[in-house]
Regions:
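Intrinsically disordered, low-complexity serine/threonine-rich repeat tracts
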Residues: 24, 28-33
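C-terminal motif of bacterial Sec signal peptides marking the signal peptidase cleavage site
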Residues: 13-16
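Bacterial signal peptide processing site
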Residues: 18-20
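Sec-dependent signal peptide recognition
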Residues: 2-7
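Short, solvent-exposed recognition patches
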Residues: 35-137, 144
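Surface-exposed amphipathic alpha-helical segments
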Residues: 153-171
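Short helix/strand-capping connector loops at secondary-structure junctions
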Residues: 143-151
Length: 171
């Protein structure tokens, strides 16, 4: 009787070990397949200067080299489409704002939140749409008929006068 029980235990051990390997193989294959399905490539190419960005985008952008305490820039471009300048503090831990320019007349802000305040104002000859809350502007967007522009404000606090002054330095 002991021999039969021992043989039965050995058979169960062999069978259960074999099953474990098959499950592991299936999980590994599923993980490999899932890894291939995720991720969208970043279309932006980070560069050192606005001139380099202009070569990639096919047009130029004039923008301030700093704004208030945000004097560390990340400049990036999408081929034949957009230039973006992101203004960080010196430690690059806080984003103040970002400026974008792209071909066309569509809204390129990428911000589709709803705000309490939305106004269309004149800055020189430009009609600028400003969106924000409590007197602080979060988004300013405009077009010159050929290019679209936007200012997305993150941690910097900008009012209408600040935005107007900033827009006058962007081309």
């Amino acid at each position: 009787m002991k021999k039969i029980l021992l043989m039965l235990l050995l058979c169960l051990a062999v069978v259960s070990c074999g099953k474990k390997d098959e499950v592991t193989d299936e999980v590994t294959e599923a993980s490999t397949t899932q890894a291939q399905d995720y991720g969208v490539p970043n279309p932006f190419e980070i560069v050192d200067t606005l001139d380099e960005a202009a070569k990639i985008a096919g047009f130029s952008l004039e923008a301030p080299i700093e704004y208030a305490d945000y004097n560390s820039l990340v400049i990036q471009a999408i081929a034949d489409d957009m230039i973006e300048v992101i203004y960080f503090d010196a430690e690059k831990t806080h984003e103040g704002l970002r400026i974008r320019k792209a071909v066309g007349t569509d809204d390129i802000s990428g911000d589709y939140n709803e705000y309490k305040e939305e106004n269309v104002v004149k800055v020189g000859e430009l009609e600028v749409t400003e969106k924000g809350n409590d007197g602080n502007i979060s988004i300013a967007s405009w077009t010159d008929g050929t290019y679209s522009y936007s200012i997305n404000v993150d941690e910097a606090l900008l009012n209408a006068d600040d935005i107007s002054n900033l827009i006058s330095n962007i081309k």
